[in-house]
Amino acid sequence: MARTVNCQYLKKEADGLAFQLYPGELGKRIFDNISQEAWSLWQAKQTMLINEKKLNMMNVDDRKFLEEQMVNFLFEGKEVEIEGYVPQKDDE
């Protein structure tokens, strides 16, 4: 049976992550409060950020920026700003 969490991003009960994907206290917070669906949404945004901003995951500043964006997206309800990106409309 799947583990469920009260997802802070989706604001509903949903299937939780199978295991802690991110290290440390933030990783525990994500594991306890973020659903698989919300994590998948974040991963898509993360990929776009890395590509559009040409982030280097070996660079500490780039990793810190990405972590800040992740917290803003998952816990504070802030949309990720990606220059030039226009979301596709449902009727397209």
UniProtKB/Swiss-Prot annotation:
The keyword Iron applies. The keyword Iron applies. Keywords: Iron. GO terms for molecular function: iron ion binding. Signal peptide: none annotated. GO terms for biological process: cellular response to oxidative stress. It holds the Pfam family Iron_traffic. GO terms for cellular component: cytosol. Disulfide bonds: none annotated. Belongs to the Fe(2+)-trafficking protein family. Could be a mediator in iron transactions between iron acquisition and iron-requiring processes, such as synthesis and/or repair of Fe-S clusters in biosynthetic enzymes. NCBIfam families: PRK05408.1 (NF003817). This is Probable Fe(2+)-trafficking protein. It comes from Shewanella loihica (strain ATCC BAA-1088 / PV-4).
